[in-house]
Each structure stands twice: as C-alpha cells, then as structure tokens.
Amino acid sequence: MEKLNIKDFEINTEDVIENISDVFKDTIIDITQIVDRPPLAVSIGYDDKAYGGVHYPLKFGSMGNISLITGQEKSRKTFVKSLIEACTFGGKSNFYTDTLEIKGYLGDKYLISIDTEQSLYDSVMTAKRVPHMVGSMPDNYISLMWREKSTKERLQLLEWLYMESSYKENLGMVILDGVVDCVQDFNSLTECKEFTEKLMKYTSVTNSHLCGLLHLNPNSDKIRGHLGTILGQKAEMVMIVENKGEYSECKCKVVRGGKPFKPFTIQIDDQWMPYVSDDLERLENINKENHIL
C-alpha cells in the first residue's frame, strides 16, 4: 500500500485568503437567477427517445467543462481524438462516420490540439489528418507540439494560452494529448489536485471545453495515478478506448447531466485515417446467429 505523505495535507500559509468574509459572500448562489444549460462543444449520436418530438444530441463535452479519453497504451486514443477533431469542423468528415453523427458546436471558436508525446514526424502526420478528413484546412484549427518542452514550460504555456493570449477570448476547445506530461509526479496528491484546479479555472474563465488523453492502469479500467483519479472525478464525461485487434471499441464510462452515447468502433483505413466501423453490429449479428443455432 502506498504511504501517505503528510506534506500533501499541509496548508501553505501563503495561500491564506484576505478579506475572507467578502470572498465567502461572493460564493453564495443566487437561486433566483436563470442559468442556461452549458452549450455543447461536441456530441456523439442522438437519444433514441424523443422529448417533445425532438431527439436530442448525446453529449461528449460541453462548454466550461472537462472530458477525458482514456485507454491502455496503443489503444488508438490519438486516432479517436483525430476523428473527433475532424467531425467538430464537419466538412467531408461525415464520410468517416458511417451512420453515427459526431458533431461540433464551436462555430468560429478555436480548436487547439496539443501533443506532448509524439515526435515531429508523428505530430505533423497526426495534425494533417484533420484537414484531410474535413476536405480543407479549418481557419480556427491550431496544432501544437510540446514534446521538447519541460513540465514547467508546458504549465506556463497553458497559463498563457488561457489567461493572456489573443486566443483566450475565442477558445472553443483545447485537446491535450498527454495530460500526464503537465505534472512532475502523477501520484502526487497535492500537485495533481492543484493542476486539476487550474484546468477547472481555465475552462470556467474562458467558457471553453478541455479534452484530455490519459492512460489506464495496466489490465484495469482505472485511470493512472492520483492524476487520473482526480481528473476522472471532475470530468463530465470519460470515454474508454479498448484495442480489440483490427478495431478499437469506444464507450462512455460515465457522463454527468445526460445519457451516455452508444458504444462505437473505429478502424484505420489504408491512408491512416480513422473511421467508424460496423464491427459491433457485425458481432451482434454473429452472436444472434449462434444463439439461433
């Protein structure tokens, strides 16, 4: 069993709040105010049940919130990320989704995709998938490579992006492929909690969505380390991507404030583009036939 570090629970006197009574008053919720439901950033499919004659889209993520794409190593998480990015812009991306509608609601807001793991070659090839699938280069798509940056530099860049840059007023979604590379120790309770609090602040202040990619523990569906535990608790949606050999299955593990989207599968075509496959439907038909036999 991992030993607890008492320093993780010590209060930093530098963080003591001044004028705490005023701060307390600012946190009181006015229950008379009318608050709109957070607008969607991305949806996957539609509810089978109609409400008032309308089949509503099923949430992948909404503005002001955090989602996670998780899976074991080499489960094709980055391919799933590319598929979602392309579908967020629309264009010809529907050619890659069969009958499943993956839809974005960013308008002209920026989608900024950050990679902390891949080499220059792989980063470029990954970034090129989006314009290839969309059919053109979206004006509001930016892909960044932070592999060579230190953890401290990545944190400073994130802070600048959300709080100081010219993009902050028009951020739609940030996708962080390699969340673990933004902390020194993914098992440090204090560090991971502070980092998660920053992400929550960033998404709230800019009213944008953040989607992070994280590994699962080996042979488990639990997200790795204290970082995974804390982020998983705060995320409004957690997707698990599981490698099934020729294809990967994508399913919603948890979602807050809505119904989970239906599981779907992806394969990779001969141009290294991800597409929604019919493997689940095919397996269901085989199982039905075997049951009849």
Regions found by a protein language model. Name each.
Residues M1-S21, T32-I34, P38, Y167-N170, ...:
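C-terminal regions of RecA-like/P-loop NTPase motor modules
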Residues C87, G91, V130-M133, C182, ...:
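Conserved, well-folded catalytic cores of nucleic-acid-processing
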Residues S67-I69, L111, L171-L176, S208-G212:
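Generic beta-sheet signal
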Residues Y96-E191, Q271-M273, D278-H291:
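Conserved inter-motif catalytic segment of the P-loop NTP-binding fold
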Residues L68-T70, K74, T78-F79, G104, ...:
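Phosphate-binding/switch region of NTP-binding enzymes
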Residues G45-Y46, T151-K152, N187-L189, H215-S220:
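Short, flexible loop segments at the rims of nucleotide/cofactor-binding pockets, characterized by
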Residues N12-S123, K128-V130:
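The Walker A/P-loop phosphate-binding site
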